[in-house]
C-alpha cells in the first residue's frame, strides 16, 4: 500500500499525524533541516518521538536536507549518529557533502534524495539509485504522466508531494531569499519573498510568484496505482490541527480506495488554502489560474480545529491490534501469548492459579480483565482463554500478566536495530593555488561573443547547449575553449535530443560539458568530454567537492551563497570556480512568468532556445514593492529564470583573487556585446569601469 507521509514540526503535530493515520512522519532534529523555524525536536524529544511512532507502526524520517559548511559537518555527523542510535528509519539529504558524510558515519541508515536535489527525470532517479539511495522525492512540477513514467521504471521508491504549499521555483534552485535578504532556502531559512507583491511596468500590484497550494486528493488512488511508493503532505510550519485534518482525509482515501467527497474537499479548503487549490502541474498545465494568495480576512476554523485537537489529544484514535492466547491450569504459571499484525509475538508467565475456595473465576472474566488495555497503545482484537474449572486467580495477577505481555510486545516494536558506525574524517587539507584565477565567461545571447571579447583573453566560454547552434564555435575555438551548459530543467522525453546536441557540440569543438543536476551525469556518460560542475550542484563544502571528484568531474563552481572566507577555506581537490560578476539567478520556474502576464504563442511549444518574437525575448522586468527591477530570461523549455535586479561587482575587491580559485566567472545575461568587453577589461585592470546598480552579493555577508 502507498505510504502516507505527514509533517511533524513539533510533538503536537507528530501526535496529530500519527493519530489520524500517517504511515510515516518527517521531522527536524537540531538545526540542519529545511524548516529551521519549525519547532523541531531536542535529543530527548526525538528519541521519545521515534519510540512513539514505532510503537504504533509509523516510520520516522529525519530531514537533514540543507547545505552545510565545513565547520558544521562535524556537528551534523554527530546529529546523524545520534539519530541512528535512536532508530530513525531514513534520512533525507540534499548536500553531496552530507551524503558523503552519512555514508561514512552511518552506512546502514537508508538515505532519501530530497526534493531539494531537484530530481525531475528518470535519469536523475537512476543516478540516485546508483549512489545507493533507497528513495527519491520528485520535484513538485511534474505531471501525472511524467510521474507515472518515472515510477514504473525507477529502480528505487518514488515519493511525490500530494498536498500543500508550492514553491514558485524548483526546490533546491531558489536563491531569492538568500540574495535579497540573506536567508537561504537551501539552509532552511527561507523568508518566502515569492509571497510578496510584484508587477510589471514599474508597479507592484499583483502576486505573480505566489502559487496556490497543491491539492491532489482526487488523484491519490491514481498515484497509488501507478506505483508511487509514498504520498507526501507539506506543512511542518502549519498548525497541528491542519496536519490532523489533511492527514485524516488522505489516509481515508488511500485506505478506502476512493475519491474525496465534496465535504472532504470543503474541509481541505477550510483547513488552509490560498484562494483555492491547484492541480495544474499534475495535469500538465501552466497558467495564471494556478496563482493565489491567502486573503487577509482568512481565519482559522477554531471550532472545527478544537474538535480535531480534542480527538487526537486523547491518543486513542490509533491503537495497535493484538491477539491474546491465555492458558490457566492448576498449580502451573499462567501463560499469555500476545501477537500483533506485524509478526511480533511474545509469551509471558504469571503466578500459578490456586483451587477456588468459593466461587471460581470463569474464562469470560479472565478475558474481560485481559482486554482492559486503556492507557496503552494497544487494543485487543481477539482473546482466547483456556482455563481449567475451579480455579482462583487474583485480578491483580491478571493485570500484571497483561501489563507484562504488552510491555514485552512494546519492547519488540520499539527495538532499535543494530547498525554500524563509522568515524567522521574531515576532508584532507589541500593548499590553495597561489596564482590568480583565470577568467571564464558565460553568455546568454550569441551576439555577446565577439572578437573583442575573446581577444581580451577568456579561458572558457560557457554557452547554453540550446544556444550553441547559433554560436560561431569554429571561428573562436583556436583562441578559447567552449563548454556546453546543460539545461537546469528538462524532462525525460528531452534526453535523446539533448544527447544528440551534446554529440554535435563536441564535434564542433566544445570540449567540456557543464553539469548542474544529478540527472546530467547520465546524459554525458560515454561522451568522453571534460566535465565541470555548475552552481546548480550547490557545492558548499570540501566533502561535496570530493564527491564530485569521485564522480569524474574535473572542476566545479562553488555556491555563490558562500562568503569569501568560506570560499578560501574549502579544500580544493579539483579546480574551483566562483561567479564574480553578473546578475545572480534567483529562480527557475516551470510557469513562464512573462507568458502568464502577456501571453505568448510559443508557451505551449516548449522551445529550447529563446525565439525572437517570444514575450520574453526582451528580458522584461518584474518590479517589487521598493522599485527594484528583476529581469526575466527565457530558460530551456519555455520556463523562466528570474535574475537579480542588481549586478554582482567584485572587480575592485582583491579577496576573490586570493581565495584559491582556478577560475573566476563573468556571468553575462542582459549586457550588450560592448558591455561584456568593458566588464572583462575592468576585471583585468585594463579599464576604469563600474556598471550601475551594483551589489557585493553574498561575498561578504553570507547567509543564515
Task: Annotate each predicted stretch with a short phrase.
Residues 1-20, 24-34, 47-50, 56-84, ...:
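Surface-exposed amphipathic alpha-helical tracts and adjacent flexible/coil segments at the periphery
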Residues 122-123:
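Conserved nucleotide-cofactor-binding alpha/beta core module
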Residues 41-46:
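Glycine-rich, highly charged phosphate/nucleotide-binding loops
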Amino acid at each position: 500500500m502507498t505510504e502516507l507521509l505527514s509533517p511533524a514540526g513539533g510533538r503536537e503535530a507528530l501526535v496529530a499525524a500519527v493519530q489520524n493515520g500517517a504511515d510515516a512522519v518527517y521531522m527536524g532534529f537540531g538545526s540542519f533541516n529545511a524548516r529551521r523555524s519549525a519547532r523541531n525536536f531536542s535529543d530527548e524529544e526525538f528519541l521519545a518521538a521515534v519510540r512513539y511512532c514505532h510503537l504504533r507502526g509509523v516510520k520516522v524520517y529525519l530531514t537533514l536536507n540543507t547545505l552545510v559548511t565545513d565547520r558544521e559537518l562535524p556537528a551534523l555527523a554527530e546529529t546523524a549518529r545520534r539519530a541512528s542510535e535512536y532508530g530513525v528509519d531514513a534520512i533525507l539529504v540534499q548536500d553531496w557533502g552530507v551524503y558523503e558524510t552519512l555514508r561514512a558515519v552511518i552506512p546502514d541508515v537508508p538515505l532519501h534524495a530530497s526534493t531539494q536535489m531537484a530530481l525531475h527525470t528518470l535519469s536523475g532517479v537512476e543516478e540516485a539509485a546508483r549512489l545507493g539511495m533507497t528513495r527519491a522525492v520528485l520535484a513538485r512540477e511534474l505531471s501525472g504522466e511524467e510521474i507515472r513514467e518515472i515510477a514504473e521504471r525507477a529502480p528505487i521508491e518514488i515519493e511525490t508531494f500530494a498536498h500543500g504549499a508550492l514553491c514558485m521555483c524548483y526546490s533546491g534552485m531558489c536563491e531569492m531569499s538568500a540574495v535579497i535578504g540573506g536567508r537561504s532556502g537551501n539552509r532552511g531559512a527561507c523568508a518566502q519573498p515569492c509571497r510578496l507583491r510584484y508587477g510589471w511596468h514599474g508597479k507592484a500590484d499583483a502576486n505573480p510568484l505566489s502559487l496556490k497550494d497543491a491539492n491532489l486528493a482526487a488523484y491519490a488512488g491514481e498515484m497509488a496505482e501507478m506505483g508511487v511508493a509514498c504520498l507526501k503532505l507539506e506543512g511542518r510550519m502549519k498548525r497541528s490541527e491542519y496536519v490532523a485534518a489533511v492527514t485524516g482525509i488522505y489516509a481515508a482515501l488511500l485506505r478506502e480506495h476512493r475519491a474525496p467527497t465534496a465535504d472532504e474537499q470543503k474541509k481541505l479548503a477550510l483547513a488552509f488554502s490560498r484562494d483555492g487549490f491547484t492541480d495544474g502541474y499534475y495535469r500538465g498545465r501552466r497558467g495564471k489560474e494556478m496563482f493565489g494568495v491567502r486573503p487577509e480576512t482568512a481565519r482559522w476554523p477554531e471550532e472545527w480545529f478544537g474538535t480535531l485537537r480534542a480527538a487526537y489529544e486523547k491518543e486513542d484514535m490509533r491503537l495497535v491490534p493484538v491477539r491474546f492466547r491465555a492458558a490457566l491450569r492448576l498449580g502451573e504459571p499462567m501463560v499469555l501469548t500476545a501477537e500483533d499484525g506485524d509478526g511480533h509475538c511474545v509469551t509471558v508467565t504469571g503466578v500459578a492459579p490456586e483451587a477456588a475456595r468459593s466461587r471460581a473465576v470463569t474464562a469470560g472474566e479472565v478475558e474481560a480483565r485481559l482486554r482492559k488495555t486503556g492507557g496503552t497503545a494497544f487494543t485487543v482484537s481477539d482473546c482466547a482463554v483456556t482455563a481449567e474449572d475451579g480455579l482462583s486467580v487474583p485480578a491483580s495477577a491478571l493485570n500484571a500478566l497483561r501489563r507484562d505481555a504488552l510491555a514485552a510486545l512494546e519492547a519488540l516494536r520499539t527495538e532499535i536495530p543494530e547498525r554500524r558506525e563509522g568515524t567522521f574524517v574531515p576532508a584532507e587539507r589541500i593548499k590553495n593555488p597561489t596564482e590568480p584565477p583565470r577568467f571564464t565567461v558565460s553568455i546568454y545571447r550569441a551576439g555577446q561573443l565577439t572578437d573583442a571579447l575573446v581577444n581580451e583573453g577568456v579561458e572558457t566560454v560557457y554557452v547554453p547547449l540550446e544556444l550553441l547552434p547559433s554560436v560561431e564555435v569554429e571561428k573562436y575555438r583556436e583562441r578559447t575553449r567552449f563548454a556546453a551548459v546543460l539545461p537546469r530543467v528538462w524532462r525525460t522525453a528531452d534526453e535523446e535530443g539533448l544527447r544528440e546536441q551534446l554529440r554535435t557540440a563536441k564535434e564542433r569543438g566544445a570540449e567540456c560539458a557543464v553539469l548542474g543536476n544529478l540527472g546530467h551525469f547520465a546524459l554525458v556518460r560515454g561522451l568522453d568530454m571534460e566535465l565541470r560542475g555548475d552552481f546548480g550542484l550547490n557545492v558548499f563544502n570540501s566533502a561535496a567537492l570530493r564527491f564530485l571528484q569521485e564522480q569524474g568531474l574535473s572542476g566545479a563552481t562553488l555556491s555563490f551563497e558562500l562568503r569569501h572566507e568560506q570560499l578560501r577555506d574549502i579544500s580544493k581537490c579539483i579546480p574551483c570556480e566562483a561567479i564574480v560578476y553578473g546578475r545572480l539567478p534567483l529562480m527557475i520556474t516551470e510557469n513562464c512568468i512573462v507568458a502568464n502576464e502577456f501571453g505568448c504563442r510559443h508557451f505551449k511549444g516548449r522551445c529550447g532556445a529563446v525565439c525572437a518574437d517570444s514575450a520574453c525575448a526582451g528580458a522584461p522586468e518584474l518590479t517589487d514593492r521598493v522599485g527594484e527591477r528583476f529581469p526575466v530570461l527565457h530558460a530551456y523549455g519555455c520556463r523562466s529564470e528570474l535574475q537579480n535586479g542588481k549586478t554582482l561587482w567584485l572587480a575592485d575587491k582583491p579577496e576573490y583573487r586570493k581565495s584559491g580559485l582556478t577560475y573566476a566567472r563573468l556571468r553575462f545575461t542582459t549586457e550588450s556585446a560592448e558591455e561584456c568587453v568593458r566588464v572583462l577589461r575592468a576585471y583585468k585592470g585594463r579599464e576604469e569601469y563600474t556598471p550601475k546598480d551594483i551589489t557585493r552579493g553574498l561575498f561578504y555577508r553570507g547567509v543564515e
